């Protein structure tokens, strides 16, 4: 049975300006969902409320039917909610292998278990050839692979990806899409927010389109593209997947 990450009736205001109004979003394990919209639509604020970076004024976040609205990010992580920020999160002066090990050392594992898990993650993310490469020398796509390996070290049930396609070349985009498919195949639920609409819709089963702080529509990528209102306020008439 699928587990759920749910945002229910979220509201958020800044200086009396409502930026998110009655937004509900749901992600199941084993599916990839997009959270998209034009600038100022409220998608980033909604995303940050689900991550735990921003507290909603009203509404609730549920993880596996437990209300986590008031929990800090590290408690959400322990419950299975992973987060990859847009900004580089690898340690620049540490090797790729040591970046993964740094996360494993926070878990109650024996040295042998840590080493075995480290090698497993390096293998699964095709990082063996980069194991001794320092974080500052990694390309954008390589860095993303290390960051995903670090996130997987916590055995998450859900991973929230903030702008995963930003600042990487077209070949790396394909690699990141493949990695996201691998996450889905593992049964992990993935929520993506990104300004690269075509790349995001190309990997999602469903997407939510926010506009003026509200959910304008939700559906499959093709349903999103075919929606006249979405084309009017966001995609334009010439957009194709």
UniProtKB/Swiss-Prot annotation:
Compartmental location: Cytoplasm; Cell inner membrane
Membrane-related topology note: Peripheral membrane protein
Primary location class: cytoplasm
UniProt keyword annotations, A-Z: ATP-binding, Cell inner membrane, Cell membrane, Cytoplasm, Membrane, Nucleotide-binding, Translocase, Transport
Class of this enzyme: translocase
GO biological process, one term: transmembrane transport
Positions with a binding annotation for ATP: 37-44
EC number: 7.5.2.-
Domain ABC transporter stretches: 5-237
Any one GO CC term of the record: cytoplasm
Quaternary structure and partners: Component of the lipopolysaccharide transport and assembly complex. The LptBFG transporter is composed of two ATP-binding proteins (LptB) and two transmembrane proteins (LptF and LptG).
Task of the protein: Part of the ABC transporter complex LptBFG involved in the translocation of lipopolysaccharide (LPS) from the inner membrane to the outer membrane. Probably responsible for energy coupling to the transport system.
Stated name of the protein: Lipopolysaccharide export system ATP-binding protein LptB
Phylogenetic placement of the source organism: Bacteria, Pseudomonadati, Pseudomonadota, Acidithiobacillia, Acidithiobacillales
Gene name for this UniProt entry: lptB
